Swiss-Prot record:
Plays a crucial role in the metabolism of thyroid hormones (TH) and has specific roles in TH activation and inactivation by deiodination. Catalyzes the deiodination of L-thyroxine (T4) to 3,5,3'-triiodothyronine (T3) and 3,3',5'-triiodothyronine (rT3) to 3,3'-diiodothyronine (3,3'-T2) via outer-ring deiodination (ORD). Catalyzes the deiodination of T4 to rT3, 3,5-diiodothyronine (3,5-T2) to 3-monoiodothyronine (3-T1), T3 to 3,3'-T2 and 3,3'-T2 to 3-T1 via inner-ring deiodination (IRD). Catalyzes the deiodiantion of 3',5'-diiodothyronine (3',5'-T2) to 3'-monoiodothyronine (3'-T1) via ORD. Pfam families: T4_deiodinase. It comes from Mus musculus (Mouse). This is Type I iodothyronine deiodinase. Its EC number is 1.21.99.3, 1.21.99.4. The active site is at U126. Belongs to the iodothyronine deiodinase family. Keywords: Cell membrane, Endoplasmic reticulum, Membrane, Oxidoreductase, Selenocysteine, Thyroid hormones biosynthesis, Transmembrane, Transmembrane helix. It comes from the Eukaryota. The lineage of its organism: Eukaryota, Metazoa, Chordata, Craniata, Vertebrata.
């Protein structure tokens, strides 16, 4: 094991201990002060829209916090961020993705000249991803003539055999590429109006873009010109609108005197 790999595992160990401590403290506080902890979680849910999501009552999701499934999911997300290679201003990782037809391609295959390419990472079991899907579709409609869009379906955020929410979409963790493609096809019923591809079963794009559970990027000419903060708390399609308005608006011509 080389020094970089050893350093990575040391970072993972530190994160493991941090998450374990956070979950243990959260569990104790939820036992001692259930009302206060619930209000705190609901306040966080206001930011994602979860607390206003008509599909979910608080009892569908609040009690799942600080469970063993919560621990493993948060740990996975934190560990994945150590693999982040998508830097603002840097070259976008040209990861392999798979079309719903089964054909393999690369993210850069969807770049067309100098047109911005919006990457939308998410899954059907991520409530905020679906709640804000119409916002994303409006982006596609409004900028169809000047930008391109790509949905990359990644591993499930709240699979039924993972950190599950009651009354959520019923999809288990993907055990094969076929299962991932089948889950991604559910998005077609929502008329995404842009290509949908899936991440590989090695979760390459999800790791290199630190995309779990959901995230937005804008690429132009192979470079990252917008890196949205990680969801669900900071997943915001309207930020992408502001970026596209700046990138796609031609400079005003100032007449010479």
């Amino acid at each position: 094991m080389g020094l970089p790999q050893l350093w990575l595992w040391l970072k993972r160990l530190v994160i493991f201990l941090q998450v374990a401590l956070e979950v243990a403290v959260g569990k104790v506080l939820m036992t001692l002060f259930p009302g206060r902890v619930k209000q705190s979680i609901l306040a966080m849910g206001q930011k994602t829209g979860m607390a206003r999501n008509p599909r979910f009552a608080p009892d569908n999701w609040v009690p799942t916090f600080f469970s063993i499934q919560y621990f493993w999911f948060v740990l996975k997300v934190r560990w994945q961020r150590l693999e982040d290679r998508a830097e603002f201003g840097g070259l976008a990782p040209n990861c392999t993705v798979v079309c719903l037809s089964g054909q393999k391609c690369n993210i850069w295959d969807f770049i067309q000249g100098s047109r911005p390419l919006v990457l939308n990472f998410g899954s059907c079991t991520u409530p905020s991803f679906l709640l804000k899907f119409d916002q994303f579709k409006r982006l596609v409609d409004d900028f169809a003539s000047t930008a391109d869009f790509l949905i990359i379906y990644i591993e499930e955020a709240h699979a039924t055999d993972g950190w599950a929410f009651k009354n959520n979409v019923d999809i288990r963790q993907h055990r094969s590429l076929q299962e991932r493609v089948r889950a991604a096809r559910l998005l077609l019923a929502r008329s995404p109006q842009c290509p949908v591809v899936v991440d590989t079963m090695q979760n390459q794009s999800s790791q290199l873009y630190a995309a779990l559970p959901e995230r937005l990027y804008v690429i132009q000419e192979g470079r990252i010109c917008y890196k949205g903060k990680a969801g669900p708390w900071n997943y915001n399609p309207e930020e992408v609108r502001a970026v596209l308005e700046k990138l796609c608006t031609p400079p005003r011509h100032v007449p010479q005197l």
